[in-house]
Amino acid sequence: MDTNSVHSHNTEVAFDPLEVIDTHRLQEKWQEGWVSQTLCQVNDCVVRLGAGHGKFHWHKHDNEDEFFYVVEGRLIINLNERTVELGPQQGFTVPRGVIHCTEALERTVILMVEGSTVTPTGD
């Protein structure tokens, strides 16, 4: 993670099944850096909301794929051999074992879908 950024990863599920998920209310509390919150669990996966700007460190997930979906802003996903830039309503899957580094040059809001056993900061 960029050393100038604050980051927080809450892996506790925030919403139960049959409960309305209000992401706007969550985002109002988040001020700077990167913040992520596990919204819900769907079968063996979790859906996380992330918001912020800055650069996350290079990492990989040994056993789980990771799906990113941009709600607002722009997300850059750096891979060893290429860079992918996503805008609103675009998504991208990073397969398990692939080293990657995400970056947002402006405040960006993303949804992530990944296995419930994933470590958000990488293996």
What is each model feature region?
Residues 1-48:
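A short, N-terminal "cap"/entry segment at the start of jelly-roll beta-barrel domains
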Residues 32-33, 46-62:
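Conserved short histidine dyad/triad with adjacent acidic residue
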Residues 43, 71-72, 87-88, 106, ...:
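A cytosolic small-molecule/anion-sensing beta-strand core signal
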Residues 46, 55, 74-76, 83, ...:
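Structural motif
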Residues 51-52, 61-78, 113:
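Short, conserved beta-strand element in jelly-roll/cupin
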Residues 79-80, 88, 104, 122:
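Short glycine-/acidic-enriched loop or helix-start segments at secondary-structure transitions
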Residues 80-96:
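Short acidic-glycine-tyrosine-enriched beta hairpin
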Residues 96-123:
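Ligand-binding loop in jelly-roll beta-barrel domains
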